[in-house]
Amino acid sequence: MIGFLIALMVLPLATAVLLMLFRDSAGQNTARWMALIGSVVTLCVAVTTVAKYQSEMVITEASQPVQPRIEWRHTWLTYTPQLDSKSGLTPAPVKLEFYLGADGISLSLIALTALLTISAVLISWETIKERAAEFYICLLVLESCLIGVFLAFDLLLFYVFFEFTLIPMFFMIGLWGGSQRNYASIKFFLYTLVGSLITLVGLVALVLAAVKGGVTTPFSIPELASHFTAHPIPIQTQVILFLTLSAGFMVKVPLFPFHTWLPLAHVEAPTAGSVMLAGVLLKLGSYGFLRICLPIYRQACEQVGLPLIATLSVIGIVYGSLCALSQRDIKKLVAYSSVAHLGFCMLGLFALNAEGVTGSVLQMINHGLSTGALFLLVGMVYDRYHTRQLDDLGGLANRIPLIAVAMVFTSMASIGLPGLNGFVGEMLSLAGMFKVPVVGPFYAVIGTSGVVLGAWYMLTMVQQGFFGPLREPHDVHDPVRDMSPREACAFLPLAVMCVWIGVAPQPFIDLMKPDIQGIVTGYDGSNARTIGGSSGTPESLTAVDR
């Protein structure tokens, strides 16, 4: 199993290196096929890893609050701090490790990343005509960095991959984006970089506190969680560290009011860039909260995180929905819908109970599938009409019926129609918040308004753009082709997953259930409680290679 984890991270990077070596001799078509084959192989490895994870791991009790079920640790540096002059004791050596791991949460997000990368490659097949090899290199490096974030159980490794995701996305927007691509890419880079630098200060302070507390592996996320659960940091210090660490995560989500970089980045990014940005990159913020903040800063999350993040989340849900309702550019409409949908993720996450966190993780996956599919379809419309303005489009179902049907289906999934994927995540997130004493129902009721507003702006977009009298730009004269087989191959896997999760969500919940219960232990006192299953001691699957 350890080999699978390493392969997941190395395969996209190796494909990118091959493309880099042969980019001069390889033509456009060769570059496309190399990128497609590399991304398909990565998805196959991801699916195989999930299947083996479910069927072959030994079931044991979890030894720590946050423990990867598969892990590989390699010590690459040992450092002995200076003698403590006050106590006269020799400090224990501090180890720096290369610590990879996986559990049900990370494997679910890795599979999502691998699936969306294939869709991104296919949708760029004919639209990226200049420097195609370089474009696919950026895309594959981005995939490798994203997978690295989800596999990292070491703070240093996590931060390195977290930051490296900025570089390929910066180039994808800046080199292959729209007319304002330079401004959009710089704004995206600076916004996220400033937030991440503040997060770095929080990480350094956390590591120093761990070293002072005698932790010999101060970068190990599971050991930090275990240590600070048993020996909590004083609440005033904990709140400061929580807020510092949260800065980069809030920008990356993005939470209101740190969202202003997102609409422009989406509008100017190529279709593949928007798919990866909305589908996976925006999940890094909520994943950082889930993986680091919730297990380590428990009192701060309860006393400060819940009211602060829940307030910003419901504001983002309502504000993002109203902004989406006012948009005439379809791509910008979908971008603002992401602000609203990710508000549900954060609302469920900071319910700090099993239902809310389960709904939050499901919503991360569901948003990646449905919004990724929406950006694919918007890109298809733009490729045919060279506009995304609703004022220029209407009655398109008469000309491109397959794309229209796909847009209706995906809009229903995004709204949260029962039977499709969006319903499960939103309802669990809201149910978790309803359980929070005193303030929970207040936040949940406001959040519920986002469901109504979501139906309003998505149905308005579908009705105005795809039904009613035919309205097309004046410069369109040739017969407009409908969805091609290549585009269908990019879209259909996402649609299948939307139906699968909507109709049968339990296997996906079961995959993540023990890990979520480990994270919420100590918050709701329901460590043995399961979602959609029987009560009992939470199970964990462990395989260690040291």
Question: Model-derived features: where do they sit?
Answer:
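Transmembrane helix-loop-helix hairpins at membrane boundaries of multipass inner-membrane proteins
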Residues: M1-F4, L21-L122, E126-I137, T216-P218, ...
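Alpha-helical transmembrane segments of multipass membrane proteins
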Residues: A16-L21, I118-L122, L146-G148, F171-M172, ...
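C-terminal ends of transmembrane helices
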Residues: A16-Q28, T117-K129, F171-Q180, V253-V267, ...
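Central hydrophobic cores of alpha-helical transmembrane segments in multi-pass inner-membrane proteins
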Residues: F4-F22, L36-T49, I110-S124, L142-S144, ...
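Structural signature of hydrophobic alpha-helical transmembrane segments
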Residues: M1-L11, A102-T113, L156-P168, Q238-V251, ...
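Juxtamembrane/interfacial segments at transmembrane-helix boundaries in multi-pass membrane proteins
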Residues: A51-E97, L197-H259, F289-L308, G356, ...
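Predominantly late transmembrane helices and immediately cytosolic-facing juxtamembrane segments
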Residues: F256, T371-L374, A444-P479
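Alpha-helical multi-pass transmembrane bundles of energy-transducing inner-membrane proteins
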Residues: A26-A31, C138-V141, C145-I233, T237, ...
